[in-house]
């Protein structure tokens, strides 16, 4: 068989036709001042990009006010403007004009809209800015969207993408890492970029995205607010035993010894006070690990015992900082003045003291959590006595960063480093995994004197710095405590706040002495989850800067009315709302669906998490009487015409235990799998419509009971004693139709 040969002319003609066809479909893009708008003439769609962030919007379509797609485009390009004329089914003119970091869109058909998709993955997150503040702090868990969220923040580039206030961003059903964006024009709309948002708008001088060494903030126990400087080995054994028994099954991991162990002339960070810790630090670390927990330690890395240093018989005199009179200075927060400040302008201090000491703590002792203290006051002292330093040409901030670089390099990426005793925020973004953001708190609600310690300090830090959490590091507002004289209601407010913001969760209570009711506050809020802030600004800040630079210990003007955690998880989309009463007497508190960014044209279930009570539904507002300093936590979920899981008994977010969930409309079965805590019962709280009735509950463990209420609430309680080899609880709730 002969193969027909194409002539050169035929081949050239074919290529020309192909090129003409491609050219007719692909319009030359409009490019101006960093913006790029590409037009696909065949599909009649737009793609919008910017040099700062790459792709902004794609597959953009034009729609008329009556929801008809506008087609038959005619394109006109000038140096600074793109114009699209549509001819079917309506004539209209659309202009796209860019000026610096703004894209302005105008249409001749008021009420028309643009519809497309925007990248919105883990690195480009839903956001709100300060002008949108309504007294509620919004946070997110999973790929969420809401009617009151009109911006996306691009974490890697520190760029805020602000759509118009009438824009509606909803998750794409086929790809939850994208947003469907609807931009209404009346007759104009603007898309704005705010570059260097944290750096310039918020004044965060050293902005750097949080390295992904850890996915969630740590959960643990700290000795300080139980025993302070008097902590002993016996105390640590007793608390470790209690933590392993009572809270380890619920997610607590770290047992952290705080300052105390270096007191005495012979004690240092490696050779502890023998009276208080007769078997030493390495033995205690091994004991903690033997209980399935992880050892953590407070260390002022800017100090060392002068008489008996850690890594030599005697350090050279030029290892230490001195004042103008030649005196040594006690390091911050250590047990006594035997630990003095080191002179890190001398590089030998890092090589011969810091690195060897930390290497022993990690590689020989098994350190996994470092509370890295003392640097704020060290910098102050260095600046005051710089002339006496080994190398006075070095500034305190330069030295500080060098020290922390050495700490990170020595400890590696598997040790959580939590900065402590900070001043200026951000010098060690990228090196710290987390940091304290404020002063010390105390297990009382109000301070006993002006500027005294109390849980008010905790709340100022938590709300004033939440915009940093899981963006640049994990924020540590200081420890959580619920013991007396704090009331049960105050304890609910404290644990609900930390759990719904996802900040570092370090408790400091005598766990084996807590009443069961208060212990349950910890159990139902541990572990932490990878929550991100939606509100990317310091909440109603009174003071958080010095000389224009963000400083520690933020003070807010007032605490928020509520925290609204928006969740996208196994159980679908829902809100976990903590509604606060900060008053000293019982008071009514309210919210509306519109305030939460929910659809006021729909109806929503309300489930009271702490009281395990169904509060009915709302399509507008809800009001409740809340006790003084108390919190009402509601799970809010859109009503559907089939059985819905509202909550579990395990965790305030309902995300920790639930692994799978499915409703089968053919067999009328709600089924799923859950992770349960051995020795603890596990409940599902389900709403069912009135036309369905439970016929059977099946599980791979004992079903303790199921109860139904007239309002539609169904509770099913299971034993946690699973069969040998079973990793999860598997369950089926089977219904049948009934006439109503």
Task: Please give the residue ranges for each predicted region.
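C-terminal beta-strand-rich structural cap/linker in extracellular carbohydrate-active enzymes
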Residues: 620-654, 710-740
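Carbohydrate-recognition beta-sandwich/jelly-roll modules
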Residues: 29-251, 287, 369
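Carbohydrate-binding surface patches
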Residues: 498-501, 506, 542-598, 637, ...
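Glycan-recognition surfaces
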Residues: 312-339, 343-348, 398-516, 541-547, ...
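Solvent-exposed beta-hairpin/edge-strand motifs
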Residues: 63-65, 120-131, 595-611, 687-701
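Aromatic-lined carbohydrate-binding/catalytic grooves of carbohydrate-active enzymes
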Residues: 217, 221, 225-355, 359, ...
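Bacterial N-terminal signal peptides
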Residues: 10-20
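Bacterial Sec-dependent signal peptides at the C-terminal "C-region" and cleavage site
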Residues: 19-29
